Every structure is written in C-alpha cells, then in structure tokens.
C-alpha cells in the first residue's frame, strides 16, 4: 500500500491598515517645509527629516523630529545642520543598528565650491554625536543628491552625484563609513560608463 500526498503553497496578502489619524510632522509652519524623509529606528520608533525655508535664519535648513513606537513625538523638532549660511537642503536619513541615526544633506558653498554633501550622526535620544562632517572628498563644482543606507555592524554608506568629476558632466560617487562615523577607505566612482550624465541613483544595503 502506498500513500500519496500533495500540498500547495499559498501566500496571503495582508491589506495595510491605518493606525490612528494622519499627523503634522513639522511644528514650525512659517514659509515652506518640504522634502521629508523618514527612517525606522531599531527601538520601534522612527525619525522624520525635512527642509524648512527661513527657519534657521538663512535660506533653507534641515530639521528633524523623533517619534516613539506609538507614533508620539519625542521632544521637539530640532535643527540638524550646524552651518546655516546659504542653503542646507534635500536631506536623507537612515537608522543605525545602535538605535541612532545619521542624516545627510546638500550645503551650498560650505566646501568652497558650489554644493557639497554633509552629515551628522545622532544617538537614539537625538543627541548629536560629534560635529557635522563633510562626506565628499572631491569638492570642485557640485556634489548633491545624497542618499544613505545603513550597514550591518553599525556603519553606513552614502552615494551622491558629482559634476565633471569623471570628466563628463554628472557621475555617481560613494563613500563607506564605519560604526564610529569614520570614512572607511576613499570615495569611489560607482558608474563605469561616463559619457553624458549618470545621476538619480538610489542605494540599499545587502544582508551580506
């Protein structure tokens, strides 16, 4: 006597359910608050960042707000960029494995030549760790459109576009950082093909 059995694999798609009502992230409302970016935190909460016009006294500035796992604001919104001259805008944020997070943004004129990209690390309570730091090594012309991704072990990686660094309009560059926020190696070109423009890149970490 032989027994035969068969099974079918099924998957269930769960319909997302809203939790509570929509809420306003920014407290300061004069001018414009735009370009928001959100990252989850390892403790169950999340952090929102955005750029705000005129709030820091000089053009655009970058601000943030922490939320707990229940969606309640933790503390007040806070200014992220220390340099306030000209514009600091278009932020990117990623959570880190230690419960903190890192924010990066474009800053006009700070590196001495057009836009550069800068960052600031925070602990889980939104206290700044160290001072803001320049991410791009090459400073000629423009470096902008910064994106971040966290890495296993507590580090993170950034990518951005740089004007004429590869010899032909826009190219895409990256830089790794260790868990202490120190650059790990040199910045590197990501695109191999350099004719015309390479831009609008995204970044994601892999489990290995």
Task: Label the model's feature ranges.
Residues 1-14:
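Extracellular glycosylation-rich, acidic/polar low-complexity regions of adhesion-
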Residues 13-208:
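Extracellular, repeat-based ectodomains that mediate carbohydrate processing or recognition
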